[in-house]
A protein has these predicted regions:
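Membrane-water interface at transmembrane helix exits
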Residues: 30-42, 67-75
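One-carbon transfer enzymes
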Residues: 96-286
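Juxtamembrane/interfacial segments flanking transmembrane helices
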Residues: 70-89
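Membrane-cytosol interface motif
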Residues: 86-98
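Residue-level signature of transmembrane alpha-helical entry/exit and packing/kink sites
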Residues: 15-19, 49-57, 176
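Short, Lys/Arg-rich, polar N-terminal cytosolic tail immediately upstream
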Residues: 1-9
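Membrane interface segments of multi-pass transport proteins and intramembrane proteases
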Residues: 7, 38-52, 91-94
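Alpha-helical transmembrane spans of integral membrane proteins, capturing the lipid-embedded, hydrophobic core
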Residues: 16, 20-28, 32, 57-65, ...
Length: 286
């Protein structure tokens, strides 16, 4: 259970310990404050039960949140718990949701990119603001033009060696980056500028069949040649290495004896279209 919490919150063991201590001390402190205030206002066994219940409920709803932030500050976890509180307030409708602005990075035809754009169109707080292609004259640039989305063609050397594209992303207010068939390695300066805010989809079950040069039909051919009984998709956070970030979602399919690299590619493509947009929707709100 603790391992699952650590993975869900993406924190170190030490930070997880401090977070759990914060929750525990907050619960104990809230109970103490509730009893103290109840005694201070003079509530006892003869008090109408509803008044006592409403007072304690108010302390639980409002006092708990304040105490939680105070204890979190003491333990050096204020940022984590303030984000936690904001999520609760957004779900309650007290705070508006952050406006999510996506940049999609792609290298080819752009079918995944178009699928994401169509899905995102129905969500008022999320928008695709920018398409970045690693190649000129690609299908994804035509898609950008069709949907009226600004598009840029990367210069690989400048992408690897300068902060130019980070400045472009920031000037557009981009909050998250989605890789959709993007074949270049993401440079360290970009992952540092968008920590845990870059997502990728890989056409295999990582950690198998990942790494430099493993993309498209090369992956499916390797799966067929290995005689694997199953394959699938992996959606993961992006770090400084190829196909190495934290796994967010995986979906498996059976590889039939009659499958070829081409037929397997078609199956995997259907999985990508079915799951990638909905996973992105959850990912941007985590």
């Amino acid at each position: 259970m603790l391992n699952k919490l650590q993975q869900k919150w993406n924190v170190s063991s030490r930070k997880l310990f401090l977070i759990l201590c914060t929750f525990a001390i907050t619960g104990t402190s809230t109970a103490y404050v509730s009893r103290s205030i109840t005694a201070w206002v003079g509530f006892n066994e003869t008090t109408f039960w509803l008044w006592a219940f409403l007072l304690r409920l108010s302390i639980l709803i409002f006092g708990y949140q304040i105490i939680l932030l105070i204890v979190a500050f003491v333990f050096g976890q204020f940022k984590f718990f303030w984000n936690y509180e904001k999520k609760i307030l957004r779900r309650m409708g007290v705070l508006p949701y952050e406006q999510i602005k996506l940049a999609i990075f792609a290298s080819g035809k752009g079918s995944n990119a178009e699928n994401i754009i169509q899905y995102i169109e129905n969500h008022k707080n999320t928008h695709v603001k920018l398409i970045i292609s690693s190649r000129p004259n690609t299908g994804v640039l035509d898609i950008a033009a069709r949907y009226g989305i600004e598009a840029i063609v990367l210069d690989k050397k400048r992408f690897d060696e300068t902060p130019e594209y980070i400045e472009i992303l920031k000037s557009q207010g981009i909050t998250h980056i989605v890789l959709a068939g993007f074949l270049l390695k993401v440079p360290q300066q970009l992952t540092a500028a968008y920590p845990n805010r870059i997502i990728n989809i890989h056409p295999a079950l990582l950690p198998s069949y990942g790494g430099k040069g493993m993309y498209g039909e090369k992956v499916h051919q390797a799966v067929i040649e290995a005689g694997d009984k199953e394959s699938g998709i992996t959606i993961h956070d992006v770090d400084d290495h190829y196909d190495n970030g934290k796994i967010i979602f995986q979906k498996k399919i059976e590889v039939l004896p009659t499958d070829t690299a081409g037929s397997l590619a078609e199956k995997i493509h259907l999985l990508e279209h079915k799951y990638y947009p909905s996973v992105i929707k959850k990912w941007v709100r985590r």
